[in-house]
UniProtKB/Swiss-Prot annotation:
The keyword GTP-binding does not apply. It holds the Pfam family FAA_hydrolase. Involved in the catatabolism of testosterone. Catalyzes the hydration of 2-hydroxyhexa-2,4-dienoic acid to 4-hydroxy-2-oxohexanoic acid. It comes from the Bacteria. Coiled coil: none annotated. This is 2-hydroxyhexa-2,4-dienoate hydratase. The gene is tesE.
């Protein structure tokens, strides 16, 4: 497909939905022929509009990596998107749903990677990722969809910047060489009650494997990972709906804690 006007029109529609905190019908309803590559270019146009408004790219994310999340969303391959400085909040922050423009947020517990070296696919391996990583930390990614009722296909979520909302990273930073990331156990609670658990192996067998996949996928588009960027590696457990008044806490074995709460 890859019609320039189509790409720009859909990117503009998603950007306006983001800014006005409203949802759209799935793009694939009216454009079933749309490809994942089309969707990626739509997300890039949306990103350029965000950058033009003053936002700065600080990292990248992979999503829909674990089977529970794939089954929940009925999307059976990973998605990918970009993180900007406006999405990041401090660990423990009280996030206003209105100020953050969140519409139908869901919480994900995952592992964040901070890079100390550039990486560019193709050919990036798990070992390359670990060698290029300065530290890992627990992370809450709050995903949000500009698509009605999360009725997404892979093309819809990629176009919508991988359903990115906001994120917080725990204050404890750990050298990944000291950890078995595949065996790292995550426990998440919502308002003091258990809300999810999972192992690092839930994410493509190993979180660094997911990061390598992302490096190679973006490498095909000529997009590198850069030193100083943060990479979110995907949820270790099913997504949990979030609303005003909710507080989420997480602990990952050997990595420390992370928390976020929500207000109107």
């Amino acid at each position: 497909m890859s019609d320039k006007q189509f790409i720009e029109t859909q990117g503009q529609r998603l950007y306006e939905a983001l800014r006005s905190a409203r949802t759209l019908a799935p793009l694939t309803d009216n454009h079933p022929e749309m490809t994942v590559e089309d969707a990626y270019h739509i997300s890039l146009h949306m990103l350029r509009l965000r950058e033009a408004s003053g936002e700065r790219v600080i990292g990248k994310k992979i999503g829909v990596t674990s089977k529970p999340v794939q089954d929940m969303l009925n999307v059976h391959q990973p998605d990918f998107g970009f993180l900007t400085d406006s999405m990041e909040y401090e660990d423990g922050a009280a996030v206003s749903l209105k100020a953050a423009g969140l519409i139908q947020p869901r919480a994900e517990g995952e592992i964040a990677f901070m890079l100390k070296k550039d990486l560019q696919g193709p050919g990036v391996t798990r070992e390359d990722v670990l060698a290029a990583t300065e530290w890992v930390a627990p992370c809450f990614e709050i995903v949000d969809s500009r698509i009605n009722d999360w009725k997404i296909k892979i093309q819809d979520t990629v176009a919508d910047n991988a359903s990115c909302g906001v994120f917080v990273i725990g204050k404890q930073h750990t050298d990944p060489a000291s950890l078995d990331l595949a065996a790292a156990a995550m426990q998440m609670s919502k308002n003091g009650q258990p809300a999810g658990s999972g192992l690092g192996s839930a994410v493509q067998g190993h979180p660094a494997e997911a990061v390598a996949w992302l490096a190679n996928t973006l490498g095909a588009f000529g997009i590198p990972f850069k030193a100083g960027e943060v990479i979110l590696s995907g949820s270790l457990a099913p997504l949990v709906p979030a609303a005003a008044g909710d507080r989420f806490d997480m602990v990952i074995e050997g990595m420390g804690t992370c928390s976020i709460q929500f207000t109107e």
